[in-house]
Amino acid sequence: KRNPEQFMEMQSGGLYGLVFEDNSMVKEQRKFALKTLHEIGFGSAALEDSVHSGALEVVAEWIKSEGEVVDVAENIEKAIGNIVWNITFGIELTFDNDIVEQFRQYQQEAIPLAGTPLMMFLELFPPLRKLDFLFGNKIKRLQELLDIIGSMVTEAIKMTEQSFDMDNQPRSYVEAFLREMKKNKDAGKAEGNYTYQQMHSSAFSLWAAGFDTSVGLLRLCILELVNHPEVQRKIHQEIDQRIGERRIRNEDQKLLPYTCAFLQEVYRVGSVLPINFIRQTSQDTEIEGWKILSGTNVLPQYSMVHSDPNEFERPDYFRPERHIEDDNFVKDPRITPFSVGKRSCLGETLARMEMFVMIATFVQNCRFTCADEVPPPVEFTYGITRAVKEFSVRIHPRN
């Protein structure tokens, strides 16, 4: 059972969205979201084509650098941002649009603020907000950023409302939600849980979560390739021998076990969600002798398993080979980058497909090397999500 959180209250102005309490509203809305995402193409060839096209646009921009020092983040953000924007709002953006960049700037400032110890304490003691001035008005600044991003979501919804023909099949989450609202209204039904606030909060969450986590993991992939050139060579060889120059498809995972092992090791090392959402026990329970009463706030940290030496030998070492047995990739249930249970990430299917198709396409076409003689360190920044610090590389075309 989830406990209502102050951060989400600040974002939504109430208990809206897809990540709140264990009640009928959340169950209904998650079911609607999963059904909608499936209907608009999660797992479809069309969506995979869109991801592959985005990857090729990134490669084309990188190759223009002609081996000069570049930050890989900008073009990855454009590609992922366009995909998630289209899924959320049904609006196709050009690769060089500035909407994604505006979102990124505000979100980049908001995420570390949302993950500060101050916000953790605010979840447990809401009156702390009145003492915000003692901590540099960080809560106030976070609220300002959330309001700005929220207003941008509002404008995006308006664009969708103006362009979407209700007689057509929805192509996005917001279009499907608008159609459901109209259906209830036309039938003379109460709006129930299909309110504007619910749509806005859910669209906000789908966009923010789908953008930040995928970008962070893809950047970490590039950083690990640069720091481990022997791993990069093995992936090059595997793709050259088993795929050649034809386009990468998601179904190629069965042909590329080492590439899959590399990605699973990135998920383990990256732990993109280091601190999960606050939960609440629904009944008295006991864990290793510790009694936990019903209604107690708990904060499960699944990522601790990823770095546990009792689970993984020498966990500080990046070693894709730990996920290979008899030349086959072995999926490890202990590695949970998208959380677990009924409230695991709604976009996990898309995220895993994005990661595989994009990284395999990047490595098929590019070779990544250090910007300087010393490889960039693998260092993280922390917030609601965890991401590697800024770094630069040199990118060389393989063909």
Protein language model annotation of sequence segments:
Residues G14, F204, A209, E288, ...:
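Cytochrome P450 heme-thiolate "Cys pocket" and heme-binding signature region
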Residues K1-L47, D71, I76, I80-I83, ...:
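Cytochrome P450 substrate-recognition site 1
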Residues G41-S53, I63-N86, T94-F103, P127-S151, ...:
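Cytochrome P450
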